[in-house]
Amino acid sequence: MPHITHSEFLLEQLKRQRERSFLCDCTVSIGQAQYRAHHNVLAAFSEYFSTQSVDAGREDPTITLDPESVSSAIFEKLLTYIYTGDLNMDREEIESVQKAASYLGMPEVVARCTLSQDNIKNVGSPMRQAEYEDPRSPLSPDDYEPLEPISEVEERELLREDRAGDDLVSMDEAQSSSEQTPQRVGKRGRKPKTRLYEDEFEVETISAQRGRGRGRGRPRGRPRVRPLSSDSTDQSPAHQAMSPNGSSTSRGSGRPRGRPRVRPLSTANEDPRNVEDDPAANKDQEVEKGNEEQKKETGEKDDGKNDTDNPEEVTAFKRGRGRPRIKPVSTEDQTTNSENVTTNAEDGSEPAKTKDSEGTGRKRGRPRSKPVSSEDPESVISVEISGEEAGEETSQDAEKHTEEGTEDSESNPGNSVRISKRKRILSRKLKESQAGDEEEEEEEEMDDEFENDNEDWAGEEEVKPVQDKHRPICNICGNLFSEMSSLRRHMRIHKGLKPYQCTLCTRSFRQGNQLKTHMRIHTGEKPFTCTSCDSRFAQKCQLVYHCRMHHGEEKPYKCEFCGAAFATSSNLKIHIRKHSGEKPYECGECGKRFTQASTLMYHKRRHTGEKPYICDTCGMAFAVSSSLIAHNRKHTGVTPYICLDCGKPCLTAGELRKHMDVHNDIYSLKKHSILKHNVVPELETTQTSKTDPTQCPLNIPIDHQGLIARVRSALVDSQDHEIQMEPPLPILPPETSLTIQQSAEPQMIIQHADGSEPSMIFQHAEASEAPMLIQHGEPGEQVSYVVEQYEIPATAEMEHTQIVIVQTID
């Protein structure tokens, strides 16, 4: 993957945001064409937009350009240049682009347009111009001189490539000859092929002629030739012939791609005399190998010189990138290996790699082992700092550890191989995740990682188990999540981002599945069907709620205060607010508070007058969706609510509850019977109701409610009241004449509570003992009263000792 600079990455992200109209807060209008863009980006490139953006503000984000000065086609090119840095224009468009750039105040574009029109045919970005100026890049057809035919140039390029191919073939032949030389034998008895890399100067010359291509099979961004450390001081003549100035001694043979790496014995190619004289040669090799690796990684070029000057100090094996380090083995293994190497060297045969020596080093992809307790870390550090002195100290330490290792190996042979539990756990994970042939870049990262682990392990006394991966946590609210993707979706709540927008109603959502569910409202799709009835739903949660409400399924959410059960947790949460009195939703207009957000929304529509729900049949609008549903039942004739007592159909549940009051109130039933069925109620019912005046249900006009309440309270508070029981009241016919006499000391008063009508003062005639029926008002709108007289003790609140209770008869 090519390296992308910070500026290129920023431009690419801004371009993608503009293409998606994400965070675009400016609209540029040219005639009928409109372009969405970002204020700050336009203002950064244009002086015109920097002034217009301030004047426009938030109320009017549209900026209109003059089509005569800036056409839509030219503005598209300039807009592309602003967001990408590429300005592509033909010779005929240079003048128009220059005019538009001058109008918009873009001096950089004006400077480009002032160049010669003959030399500007396709003005690109500065990056592309640098590629054209690079002599190593392939020539484009426009760069050839017009007098030279293009066909001849192509033939010349083909000849150059063929010549470079011949050079590579000669290198392959030298490689095949080098493969015939005796090599180390792998642990399975195979002889891995060894390929000699070409000289740096020759390969760089060939690659420069052919262009900047990467080698076949090599990863992107990796050089074709990589110097390796020497695998052996004894090399074949073919090796020495291919490496002038003895440079091949400092380079080793790499394995072909796809071939397994073979880790040689620490004494495989070493002089037998050195093995016999120095029993700690393995550790010297490991330390020297680490020194050479550090020099090679830091870019030092004096590896070959140091190796040739001191051939005795050069170890037989030097670890390349990703190669395992060798752990010192016990004395028995070292002695056995030394004897085997000496015997094989005298016979002239290749020393074989044994299983014992194989187990002491880590395989490819395994972590470096932690030093055992018998090893002295200070000796390792001293060896890395100095040369011969470090070797002597290491030899002494090795002899000391050999004596200890002999006893340990006899008692428990596994101590010399297994180091720690942590190593075992990490090795298994890495072996599973890194199966197959890994890239060398990954091996370098592993080396760096395990080197840091070795530093940590050097200071540890006890082996600690591998800790689990930390769960992602929100740094704002502290919520924990199982995955980073869940945390990213959660952060949209705090940032207020809703990137998913509906194209039909412009509603926005935080997640894509929310938009998918919302689209079912427009399409009418209802994929979830109830198994008990034919109801269908757009969401699964709606189906679950339906089954719990209408089909007897258990309601799992119960109130801890009153025991009421609910189908959803949200309904329970709203119900608990009734007990706590919490009303978190407040109206900004009048300050009224509500327990639900939906109730607040409906309340706000009273202030604004908004009625978004419109009937498709008659066009009537409503503020609440339930009102529209009840209204549609008038057109369809559907009456889902029916009274069980009389069978009356009702449109809504509220209408049914209001109707049930007729059956529960005896006087309301009497009124209903008289009005609807012309049936006079029986007198026994009236007589029975008079036995207790305090419990007498009276149905009187609303303006007499206050008087009745005072009468009942007076009757209850009085302990010595006596009620004069009268015979059943005869209702006089309307034509009966009544005598109403004026009196200064009235005995009976009828007065409306609101004072809308004048007081009526009357009394009985001397010869009359029965109550009378009084009618007053205009003809056609007369109100009839049945007068009943009660004698009660006078109180401070009552003005008269006699109170009249009246009942209206329709």
Curated annotation (Swiss-Prot):
Zinc fingers (C2H2-type), renumbered ranges: 472-494, 500-522, 528-551, 557-579, 585-607, 613-635, 641-663
Keywords from the UniProt entry: DNA-binding, Metal-binding, Nucleus, Repeat, Transcription, Transcription regulation, Zinc, Zinc-finger
UniProt gene name: mynn
Residue ranges, compositional bias (Acidic residues): 386-396, 435-460
Region called Disordered, residue ranges: 122-146, 169-466
Native source species: Danio rerio (Zebrafish)
Primary location group: nucleus
InterPro entries, per database record: AT_hook_DNA-bd_motif (IPR017956), BTB/POZ_dom (IPR000210), HMGI/Y_DNA-bd_CS (IPR000637), SKP1/BTB/POZ_sf (IPR011333), Znf_C2H2_sf (IPR036236), Znf_C2H2_type (IPR013087)
Record-linked PANTHER family: ZINC FINGER PROTEIN, ZINC FINGER PROTEIN 271-LIKE
Extent of Basic and acidic residues compositional bias: 270-308, 350-361
Biased composition, class Low complexity, residue ranges: 243-253
DNA-binding region(s) from the entry: 254-266, 318-330, 361-373
GO molecular function: DNA-binding transcription repressor activity, RNA polymerase II-specific; RNA polymerase II cis-regulatory region sequence-specific DNA binding; zinc ion binding
SUPFAM superfamilies assigned: beta-beta-alpha zinc fingers, POZ domain
Domain BTB: start-end pairs: 24-91
Location(s), subcellular: Nucleus
Protein name: Myoneurin
Pfam hit, one: BTB
GO CC annotation terms, alphabetical: nucleoplasm
One of the GO BP terms on file: regulation of immune system process
Intervals of motif Nuclear localization signal: 428-432
Biased composition (Basic residues): 185-194, 211-225, 419-428
Family: Belongs to the krueppel C2H2-type zinc-finger protein family.
